[in-house]
Amino acid sequence: MDSIPNEDDLEKLLVAEQNVPYGKNYESFEDEENYLLELRNANALENLEHRSIPNDLFHSSQPVGSPTRNGDDIPSTLDLYSSDNAAIDTDISEDETINQRHAPQTDYRYPNTSANPKMGLEESMDIDMPSIDLDISNAAAFPRDSNLLFRNYNSHTKTSEKGSPVNFEKENQDSNVLFSTGRTSVLHIDAEQSQTNNTVTPLKDDALSLFSFENDVNGAVNDNSLDQKLSASKNSQRVSLPFFSKIELDEGSSFSGPKISARTSSGKIIYFPKKKNRHSDGLLLQPKRLADEISQVNEIGKDFNQDLLNSVRIWSENFLIVSKEKSVALKTEKLDSLQITNCTTKPQSQKLWVDTYRPQLFRDLLGDERVHRAAMHWIKAWDPCVFGKSRLQPSKSMRFNPRFTNITSDSDRPDKRIMMLTGLAGAGKTTLAHVIAHQAGYKVLEINASDDRTAHTVHEKVSSAISNHSALSSQPTCVIVDEIDGGDPAFVRALLSLLESDEKATEYSQAGNSKKKKKFKKLCRPIICICNDLYTPALRPLRPYAQIIYFRPPPQASLVGRLRTICRNENIAVDSRSLTLLTDIYNSDIRSCINSLQLLSLNNKRIDSETIKLLQPKSNSFSTSSLIQSLFLQLDNKQIRAIEASQPTYSHLDALLARIDGANDSESVLMNCFHTYLDLPFTDSLLSKPALTSEWLYFFDQLHSQCYKGNYELWRYIPYSIIHFHYLYATPEKCRLPHPPRSDLEALKLYRTRKEILDSFISTLNAYENQMHGERSILLELIRTILITINPTLKQKEDSMPRSALPSKIEHAINILNHYNLRFQQLPVGDGNYVYRLEPPLDELVWDAPTSSYSVRQMLSQELLKKRLADIKKQTLTDNPTSSNSSRKRKDFNSGKAIKRDFFGRIISEPKSEAVTSNNAALNTGDHPVSIKHAINIKFHDGFSNAVRKPISLNEILNF
C-alpha cells in the first residue's frame, strides 16, 4: 500500500482496458487455431489406423470402469469406432470397399443418422418399443451347440459390424433348450437387453410371440399374425429404439474361418471370427421383397443369416412409425379440442396474484379509511356536473372536518379540478384511483408510463375524453394519469392549459359573457393524477390546481393479515413472523410482497423465514454501517481458518472488495470512512497514514472524473481506492463506531430543495421587483420581512373580535399575501390534526422563522380567499361592460340620419322644410354647435371585378 498510483498509471490502465485482445489479427489467430485442430485430429486418426485393436484394447492397463470400456468387458462404440471399418478389419478387399460406397441409400421413413456416423439408431429415435419374440419353426437343422454371433447394423455405412458371440454349448448349459425338434421354439430379443448386454434369452412358453414363421404347403411364410400380435402387446416400454443385431449361425462348435482371441479382465477368452465379404447379400430389404427372402431362408435351411433379423427390423420400424403417427394425430386432436373449449379461459396458475386479488370494491381497500373517504368524496362532488344529480349536503361531521370543507364548492364541481395522489411506490394509489372511479360510475382512461405522454396526447385523448360524451359507452370517462412526475414536462404544461381554459370559461360564465365563454373549454370530467414525488419541478405549476391527498403505506398488521389471507387461499403454509419479515424487506410495498409470495410458491408450498431472507437484495443484504465496521475490523488467524474450512476458496480481501462493489453508492461509503477513520485509535506520530489516505482519495477523485467523462471501464478500480482504509486503520477489536456526520450530503439535499422553493417564489414576482431586489437580496432581506408581516401576533381580545372589525395588521397581512401570490394550505399531520402550511414554504429558507397560531392562519386564509374573489369580480366588470351601456351606445349611434349619395359618392341635396330649417338654425345658435358624424362601414372583398373603379385613399373616405 506504499505505492500509490499516479496519473501515468491511470493512463496505462485506461489504455489497457480499451485495447482489444486480438486487435486487427483476430482472423489470423482463428485460422491458425483451426489449422492446429485439424492437424491434431489427423495425427490421432493416423495413429489409430496403425495399431492393433484387439491386442491394444483388451490387453491394456485400463480399468474396467474406464470410458473406453463398457460394463461387460466388450468393446464399446467408442473403442471400435463403428463408422471406421478399416480399424476393425484390415484385410478387407478393395472390392468390398467399393461396395460399401455404393450401398443403397437409407429409407426416408427411417431417422437420418448419416450426419453423425457415431450416432446409432438408439440415439436418433425415442418411441415406444416392445420386445420382439421370434418363433422359428423346423429348427431341427440348427444344432444345440451352434454359436450365435451378434452383428450390429450401421445405418451410415449400410453394413453390419461384429459384436459378441454367444456360445450356447458353454455359456447356457443349464438353460432351457433353445431349439428343439418337433416343436416351435421361441427366440426372444428384449429391447433393453439388446441395447445393454447384447444377449439372447430363451422365451417362456406363456410369452408373447411377436413374429413367427411357419412353413405351409406351398413353402410360403404365414405372417398374418404380425399386426394382431403387435396390437396385442401390452408390455411395451418407453425405451430408445435399439440397434437390431443380426444373427450369423455357423455349424459346429468352432468357427470355420480365421478367428481372433480376446481376453477379458476376468481372464475369460472370447473368440471373434474374421469379417467376411457379405455386402453383396443386400442388407437393406424392401418390405415387398420380404416374403421371397423368407422363402429363400427356409429353402436354404442352415443359411439363416442376418437378412432375417434385418427384415424383422424393417417390419417393426414400419409398424411403429405408423402407430406413432396415429398416436400423435390422436393427441393433436385432443389438444385442439381442449384449446377450442378453453380458448376464453386462462389457467389459474398463469395469472398473477396481484391481478387475482386486486380490490374490486371500496370496502376491500387496504390502508387509511379517512384517505379513501376523502378521495371518494372528491369524485362524488362531480355528480351534479356529470350525472345531473343534486349536490349532496354535507353531514354534521363533514361540516366541521377541514378535510371535506376544502373539497366542496358552491358550483356543480369541486374547487380543485384535479386530484393528485402522492405517496411511496406500491402503497395502493393506482388501485384506489381505479376503485373509486368504478364505484362512482366512470369508465377509466389510464395514461401510464408506457404510453405516449406528450402535449399531442393531451389535446387528442384527454381533451376529447373530458369534454365530450362517448358514443360507444354509456358511462362517462375519468382520466387517470399514472406517474405524472416522471413524464414529459410538455404533458404537464398542456394539462395546465386545459385547467386555465376551464378557469377562464368559469369566470366568463359567472359574469354573463357568453361570447368569450365559447372561446374556452369547460372541464366536465374528473382527472386523477398519481405521483411519487410531489415536489418535482415539473409539477410546480400544477400544484395550485390540485386537491392533494397524501397516501401513506397501510399499517403492517393490516398488510400481514391480507398476505395471510392470500396464502390461505393458495394453500401455502407460512407463519406471521415470516410475513412480517417480508413486509420489512419491501418497506410495506404490497405489490412486491404478493409477487414474491407467488414466486416462492412455485417450488415449495411451505415458506419459512430462511427462504424469505433469500429474497433480500444484494445491495440491501448489509447496511452501510456494517460495511464500515467490516472495513475497520481485522480478523485473527483463527477466524480466517474457520471461514476457510467451510469455504476453501475464501479470501478476506476479495470479500471486502465484493461488498464495496455491491454497495449502491461508493461516494457515501468513502465519505463515511473519511468521517470515521480519525476517531479510531492508531499510532502514527509522523501522520504518514493520513498522508497516504489523502493520496488515495485524490486517486478516487481522478477515477470518478474519468468515469463521468465516459471512460466507464475504470469504474471497477474504484473499490481499490477504498480498501486502503482496511490496511491502514483496521484493529483486532470491534470498536464502537460513532454516528458519522452527514453534513455534506444533507447540505446538498437541503440546497436542492430550498433552491426549488426560492425559484418558485421568484417566478411569481413581476419584472420590476426582480430587477430591484435580486436573488441574494430576496433571500436575505425580503423573505424574512414578509414572514414577519404575514404572521401577526394577536392578543386574546383581538383574536375573538368579529371579522368586520379586523385590526390593521390583519389587513396588511392579507394585502401582502395577495401581492406576492402566497397562500395557506391545510395539511393533515396524523391523529386527526391539521396545520396550515405556507405555500411556497418560505419559512424553510429562514432560520428561526416566525410562526402564528392555527386560528390566525385559518382566518387569514379565509379572508384572503374572499379578497381574491372580489378582485376577480371587479376585474370582470371593468373588462366586460354591461349590456345596458352597450345597447345605449348602439342606440345613440343609430340615431343619426342617413345621407343619400349617388353612384359616384356625391351627396344628393333634398329640399328641406321650413320647420326643419328653423329647428336647425335654433340649434346652431347655441353655445355649442352640433356636428353630425356619419357612419362609415368598410368591408374588404377579396377578388377581381371589371366594374367602374376610381382610385381613392382611406383618408378621403374618412373625411367625406
From Swiss-Prot:
Subcellular location: Nucleus
Subunit structure, interactors included: Component of the ctf18-RFC complex which consists of ctf18, ctf8, dcc1, rfc2, rfc3, rfc4 and rfc5.
Binding site for ATP: 423-430
Name by which UniProt lists this protein: Chromosome transmission fidelity protein 18
Encoding gene per record: ctf18
PANTHER family registered for this protein in UniProt: P-LOOP CONTAINING NUCLEOSIDE TRIPHOSPHATE HYDROLASES SUPERFAMILY PROTEIN
Stretches with biased composition (Polar residues): 58-69
UniProt-listed SUPFAM superfamilies: P-loop containing nucleoside triphosphate hydrolases (SSF52540)
Main localization (coarse): nucleus
UniProt cross-references to InterPro entries, sorted A to Z: AAA+_ATPase (IPR003593), ATPase_AAA_core (IPR003959), CTF18-RFC_complex (IPR053016), P-loop_NTPase (IPR027417), RFC_lid (IPR047854)
GO biological process, one term: DNA-templated DNA replication maintenance of fidelity
